[in-house]
Amino acid sequence: MTIRIAINGFGRIGRNVVRALYESGRRAEITVVAINELADAAGIAHLLKYDTSHGRFAWDVRQEREQLFVGDDAIRLLHEPTIAALPWRELAVDVVLDCTGVYGSREHGEAHLQAGAKKVLFSHPGGNDLDATVVYGVNQDELRAEHRIVSNASCTTNCIIPIIKLLDDAYGIESGTVTTIHSAMHDQQVIDAYHPDLRRTRAASQSIIPVDTKLAAGITRIFPQFNDRFEAIAVRVPTINVTAIDLSVTVKKPVKACEVNQLLQKAAQGAFHGIVDYTELPLVSTDFNHDPHSAIVDGTQTRVSGAHLIKTLVWCDNEWGFANRMLDTTLAMAAIGFRFDA
């Protein structure tokens, strides 16, 4: 069965979801029937075809009135600001991928369901009242048919959660800290301009900028046993894509750096293949652009202090890796069925 999806919000993640769908060869499993985006149709087509981070899309893209064509596939374009007014029932939408980065509450999810969608997947963290939060590769098996409003967590949560799980299972984590070194984002300024966060009033291309992060809460949402045992900070750096995460954890069992690397490399080749990758090459951030993994461990940067403090550096393409996980989670949601169809 082919899953019929609609995308609400066609920004960085929405466009990368479409690109990833076509590049990964999963069109027999997923069909995009509609895109809802307030921008004009010409702009939608142009930014899908040409991308500063990921290059020119290999597929032919054209726009005819309110239809977007990718190859021979026609996708209906909508410009509807009110979720409840979207024609999901008419279009027989199975799963809405809400990639606005704005909506994430149960109320917004239920509006999609009332419009006729069978299930909703948010591309960002949602509230505690959602049916589930999924980090694919770790907890997608906990999905149930009655889980209709789901969050795919965040790109950084998807990056770090598999590594935390591996280290905890092997050595027993007592506590940890996380520093996210994240590329600049759309909520920053090109030149100095007003913003409620005074640090984000400053030009994104000229400074390393500390910002707030809810990553510690995201870790606890997946692993409640770590409540009050993880802290996180984040800085934005003057690059346009790819993120590095510095993870430090204290563990119960004594360990050596080489043993940590052996554990993570084995996982990348085995149980976490396709989700986690491992490298010891002398690479930099641009080398991980367009990498589909959630996390790439840089084994050259692993350190252990006093046998119980582990430090690792983990890379991710915060756009491309996450877009691929959106597709994975969509398929997982569809595979368990639609118990409460609208």
Curated annotation (Swiss-Prot):
PROSITE patterns xref list: GAPDH (PS00071)
Domain of life of the source: Bacteria
Role summary: Catalyzes the NAD-dependent conversion of D-erythrose 4-phosphate to 4-phosphoerythronate.
Keywords attached to this entry: Cytoplasm, NAD, Oxidoreductase, Pyridoxine biosynthesis
Alphabetical list of Gene3D superfamilies matching this protein: Dihydrodipicolinate Reductase, domain 2, NAD(P)-binding Rossmann-like Domain
NCBIfam families reported for this sequence: E4PD_g-proteo, PRK13535.1
InterPro entries per the UniProt record, alphabetical: E4P_DH_bac, GlycerAld/Erythrose_P_DH, GlycerAld_3-P_DH_AS, GlycerAld_3-P_DH_cat, GlycerAld_3-P_DH_NAD(P)-bd, NAD(P)-bd_dom_sf
UniProt record, GO biological process: pyridoxal phosphate biosynthetic process; pyridoxine biosynthetic process
The protein's Enzyme Commission number: 1.2.1.72
Site annotation Activates thiol group during catalysis: residues: H182
Active site positions, chain numbering: C155 (nucleophile)
Residues binding NAD(+), per UniProt: R12, I13, N318
Catalytic activity from the UniProt record: D-erythrose 4-phosphate + NAD(+) + H2O = 4-phospho-D-erythronate + NADH + 2 H(+)
Protein name, entry field: D-erythrose-4-phosphate dehydrogenase
Subcellular location: Cytoplasm
Sites where the protein binds substrate: S154, C155, T156, R200, T213, K214, R236
Pathway: Cofactor biosynthesis; pyridoxine 5'-phosphate biosynthesis; pyridoxine 5'-phosphate from D-erythrose 4-phosphate: step 1/5
Similarity section: Belongs to the glyceraldehyde-3-phosphate dehydrogenase family. Epd subfamily.
Primary enzyme class: oxidoreductase
GO molecular function, one term: erythrose-4-phosphate dehydrogenase activity
